[in-house]
Structure formats: structure tokens, C-alpha cells
């Protein structure tokens, strides 16, 4: 089970201070803003076990008016708390710039850390080689490349995605990309 606390969805809105304006036990301090995510995680762990639960985070907070005044503190706290619960993994959507939080989140969590966000083969290999991630996740890249693992393994050309068709109803833009021969 992956608990989705990213991309401006409800748990992410509670976590980040740009959207959480509450004044009760679920607002204000980092601990309070993280409360709902941790309660949901604890409930999932109680049902499925820690080894079957992961959490998806969006430390960049750049979607749907999201943001946090101190993402290092907020997401560092969350990573540490999730680490105490010994869940299976955290997957973090984050940029590859100098100010990225991935290595700090991985260290605070202490478990399997999956890096995600516009990965390329080169970026993925580099993150894995230097130990900044235990695994990488490819999201949108799969939409235009249903045979992505094979293409990466063979250093084959990559289909150009058509972002205007992402999340469009019907098969066009999902199942009409050519596969390798």
C-alpha cells in the first residue's frame, strides 16, 4: 500500500504550511501538520503490516499552490517519524538541483528510499551509484514508453510523449505509442 502524501492531495495539504491554515491539533507546528499523515500511516500499518506500507512525498511542493516555508524541517521530521515506524519505503518526488532534499530524507528515514521526478537513465544510474537512492521510479516516462525497461537496457531511442494527451479519456495517448520491434 502506498500512502499518497504528494502533489497537492489531501494529506499533502495538511502537511505543508502554505495550505494548512488550521488552528487545531492538525495545524500550526510541523508535528501537528504531520499528524494526519502519521495517523493514516499507522492505520495502514495496523492492517497490512509495516513491511507492506510505503509513503509517497512531494518535498518540492510545486504543484497546485503547494509549498512549505521550511521543507527541510517539515519533510525531515516526516521522514524520521516514518523511519521509526519501519515502513517498507518512502518515495519522494523531488528536483535534482543543488538544493534537493533527497539525501537528507534518505538519511532521516533510514530505510528504502525511492527517488522520483523526471528521471532519465543517466540521472537514475547516478543517484543509485552514489547511494542517494535505493531505487528510482519512472512515472510519466512510462506513458510514452510502455517498454521503457527494455529501451533503457538497450539504449534505444525513446518515444516523444504528448503531454496534451496525458490523463485524456480514451486510448489515444496511452496505448498508441509504438513499441520496439
What are these model-predicted stretches?
Residues 1-181:
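Flavin-dependent oxidoreductase catalytic cores
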